[in-house]
């Protein structure tokens, strides 16, 4: 009885072993491996292989009981697959949603030292770094699918880095940290969807598993990697600041190593790729090694080259702390988009098509180097622009204008306009504008010369608050605002500048006949280049212009520079002033014939679309006056306010203001200035007699001057009356504070007078 039970147990074990042996032979493994497997390993491997049938239903064809005809192509495919697996610098693995390794190729032993049998069927979490468990869980998790239920299967790409356990010898393991090796894994998560019979529009999905390929990153030592012609290496600090670069970088990117040292890698990477580079940098600091995505490294001559980098953190041999970053970079393409500048460090191969001034044709400033030396203090520093300069963009703004939300300086914009190309249609000239920002555009109402239809359309009339004259003065000094720029109210069109700038005075006057008569107040035939004096004070207009210099480009052969533009503007405004004084002496009929009967020039602020400003600098109102009225008179060395003289309603011509300190004012202009100071004009003139040739300044203008700044080009008010006297005078004008300061900060020189300087009347805040 005892013998029978022993024999029965032995027979049962033999049958069990034979069944396990037969089962092991069904596994797609070499017989040398299967013959050494124990029962637990056979069950583990068999279970894992059965799960693989879910991922790949075709399986192994005949080995899974399917009879099919084999062709020579199938045999070639199998052999090719085995060879590809051997030549692959990595290993293939399939992981179930629960983390069990369903399959891993035998090449894993080359990179990790762990056998295929040992890994298959076990949890991948047992072989990865504990800090990477959460990342692995996120990779294996499938979110709610967004695909239609008609799609049965789809794949979600995955790319991640894992620190896997490595048991290889130190000389063969490459770079390891704490017994773990960084493996770059890339593959896809396979999702299968099923539709429900009861509800055709509903369905469920199944997370089949992850199929990925694991690659070992190259070791850090450069001596262990053969650098080919399309590769270069660099060493950087932990913040990616370059310390050392290989000499091959010069022929691949155009930069010499010394050009890149002490700059971060982010400084030379395309802006759209900095996010991917930042993520790779973060992974590098956490895991010690990383392979970047393809990114664009900017070339020196413009454009970029596509690069992929293998970066490694090198630890200090003594302290075992991170020391630096060593990266091997593969340049994958030639330079693309050559000449496209994306960085200040890049040099364009060809100059931009849009330009300010010509580099081949000499300009006026090139022929007048003697006069230019007198303006040496206003020479500006060169500034290289990374982008082509288009005329539609106002790139030159004063950095001292912090109150403006656009960061633009009014005087800088006036002194340095950007000119349009006359070759293009509709761009014969561009206006030089000085911007002022107004909190409420309704404070400026329409003038007398505006058509009544527009007054009715916009429903704005002169109120007691606006007082009419303030609006008229605002329109004269500020002009019409540019269309399409809502935040700016009061864009003054100083003067239209043509593209061509003739060198001679006669040619320049012929090209701009509408403003040439201003120049004659300094004497007939006088061409002055010293009319603009720079300012050493910060925040001035000249400093705004000094900060940048017009760059030499090629497609504008006759454009003036910023200094020449301001000089000519000053000279032409002076000429126009004398012309107005001469026209005042003509009879009304002659004035009407000169200015054109029925012609009205009154630019104002409105909501409707306005046409571009015309060439006339003076936009006079329809209020007539045969002679200027003296608002400011001197009695026994004192200045009296308009309230004391009852001249509140008589206009004062702005053209009569002059500077007694100027050394170039002619005798006739001095007589006019004297006549202005001592004449007593009665306010008996009525509106409508004849158009006023010069804009008039009423007593109501003073309140407008208190709020806004105006530039009186060509005169120095601070030398006609001192600031304290003007301040006392303003106390008589409704108690408002009135101050006169020079924006250019030009103090009088006892040895030399001012030559066509510019001042600004500003509020005293």
Swiss-Prot record:
Question: Which compartments does it reside in?
Answer: Nucleus
Record-level GO BP terms:
cell differentiation; nervous system development; regulation of DNA-templated transcription; ureteric bud development
What would you give as a GO molecular function for this chain, any one?
A: DNA binding
Biased segments, Basic and acidic residues type: 394-404
Output the Gene Ontology cellular-component terms.
Answer: nucleus
The record's account of tissue expression is: Detected in lung, skeletal muscle and kidney. During fetal development it is found in the CNS, developing kidney, mesodermal and endodermal tissues, including developing somites, mesonephric duct, and foregut.
Pfam families xref list? bHLH_HIF1A, PAS, PAS_3, SIM_C
The answer to whether keyword Transmembrane applies is no
Disulfide-bonded cysteine pairs: these are none
Q: Which InterPro entries match?
A: bHLH_dom, HLH_DNA-bd_sf, PAC, PAS, PAS-like_dom_sf, PAS_fold, PAS_fold_3, SIM_C
State what this protein does.
Transcriptional factor that may have pleiotropic effects during embryogenesis and in the adult.
- Protein name from the UniProt record: Single-minded homolog 1
Q: Which gene encodes it?
A: Sim1
